[in-house]
């Protein structure tokens, strides 16, 4: 992966290139930004430049190994969980073949996409102490090619505290010519100590224009590319899903529609609470990552409804794919209730992530929603 393959982010690419040219390579760097902004592919492209040099044609063997994600001095850490194949102490090294396939398919893919690809979507993958112990061994060995050794830690916010503390010891006294590239979508979940040890590189959401151009280069029509880019609000992974019709939006929309209809019905018919009980029970049977994705989808849809209600149609990207009357629904979302609804959804998300009882969490959220939808 080369800098020219990265969508947008020109200023950051130029800054990284200049720093490398002048020999300024901080041993610990943190690439962070929202979903689909390209932080992981950018980190890989930067690692390639550090390992192989700036001229692609001058070291073709090295560049080929990096492009195949098989360079012996390039190491990856990413969230995993025990699976049918690896029942105990699963670490990233166990999943490298799947990881390579995953990245070659779409380097902008999400954590949820990764979990789906290795069959752990019903679990909460993490980066644990065993993972870091394995990395410490690798980074302590002599470089295969006599140059740099690079570790890319994807979704660093998934590191537990013991793993973070163990890795900090390595970062504070790093072996010579070792480079740690952390990639995060939620910098607030990282410890202050870890952040303070890294040079921070913030990526912004991608512009619709940049994404549209990239999609056209991939062979999609201008109309398809433009529509997908506007809908995906800076997330290139979502744009790719829109043009390839792989997005879970229709399923989530159906869940959302059933949910809010039952919530509205409770005011006129108390027995409709039973529908919310059934709805909560059904969604609690899905994986936690699916539940969190649905909550994120719902939060975005409530915010889109607020824009619609205030006649800001030019900022609204949502278009129903079912019989959902979006315009009528949006009349119930205003400045009087959007903050409270957002807080409840974010709290539910946090509780799901903390392994709370999802059935109770969704039932509690549903009952609160019946009140908040009618708040004047």
Task: Identify the role of each PLM range.
Residues 137, 169, 196:
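Conserved adenine-binding aromatic site and its adjacent loop/helix in ATP-hydrolyzing domains
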Residues 150-154, 167, 178-184:
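Structural recognition of the conserved hydrophobic beta-strand(s) that form the central parallel beta-sheet
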Residues 2-158, 162:
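Clamp-loader machinery-focused feature within the broader ASCE/P-loop NTPase space
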Residues 159, 168-172, 289-292:
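Short, surface-exposed loop and linker segments with low hydrophobicity and enrichment for Pro/Ser/Thr
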Residues 140, 165-176:
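Conserved catalytic/switch belt of AAA+ P-loop NTPases
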Residues 1-68, 176-179, 185-297, 301-376:
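Charged, glycine-rich active-site and insertion segments that engage polyanionic ligands
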């Amino acid at each position: 992966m080369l800098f020219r393959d990265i969508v947008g982010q020109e200023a950051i690419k130029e800054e990284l290139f200049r720093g490398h040219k002048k020999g300024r390579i901080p041993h610990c760097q943190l690439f962070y930004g929202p979903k689909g902004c390209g932080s992981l592919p950018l980190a890989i492209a930067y690692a390639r430049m550090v390992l192989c040099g700036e001229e692609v044609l001058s070291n073709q063997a090295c560049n080929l190994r990096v492009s195949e994600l098989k360079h012996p001095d390039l190491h990856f850490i990413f969230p995993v969980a025990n699976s049918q194949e690896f029942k105990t102490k699963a670490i990233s090294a166990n999943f490298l073949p799947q990881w390579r396939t995953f990245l070659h398919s779409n380097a902008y893919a999400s954590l949820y996409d990764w979990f789906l690809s290795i069959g752990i979507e019903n679990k909460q993958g993490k980066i644990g102490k065993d993972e870091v112990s394995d990395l410490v061994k690798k980074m302590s060995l002599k470089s295969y090619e006599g140059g740099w050794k690079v570790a890319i830690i994807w979704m660093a916010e998934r590191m537990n505290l013991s793993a973070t503390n163990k890795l900090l010891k390595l970062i504070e006294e790093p072996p010579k010519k070792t480079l740690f590239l952390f990639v995060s979508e939620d910098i607030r979940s990282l410890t202050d100590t870890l952040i303070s040890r890294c040079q921070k590189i913030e990526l912004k959401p991608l512009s619709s224009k940049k994404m549209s151009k990239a999609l056209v280069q991939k062979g999609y029509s201008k109309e398809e590319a433009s529509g997908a880019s506007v809908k995906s609000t800076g997330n290139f992974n979502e744009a790719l899903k829109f043009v390839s019709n792989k997005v879970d939006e229709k399923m989530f929309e159906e869940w959302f529609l059933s949910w809010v209809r039952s919530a509205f019905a409770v005011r006129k018919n108390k027995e409709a609470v039973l529908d919310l009980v059934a709805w909560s029970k059904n969604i609690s049977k899905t994986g936690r990552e699916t539940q969190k994705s649905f909550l994120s989808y719902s939060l975005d849809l409530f915010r889109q409804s607020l824009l619609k209600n205030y006649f800001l149609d030019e900022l609204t990207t949502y278009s129903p794919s079912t019989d959902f009357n979006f315009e009528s629904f949006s009349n119930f979302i205003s400045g009087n209730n959007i903050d409270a609804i957002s807080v409840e959804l974010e709290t539910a998300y946090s509780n799901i992530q903390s392994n709370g009882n999802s059935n109770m969490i969704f039932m509690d959220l549903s009952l609160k929603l019946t009140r908040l939808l009618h708040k004047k």
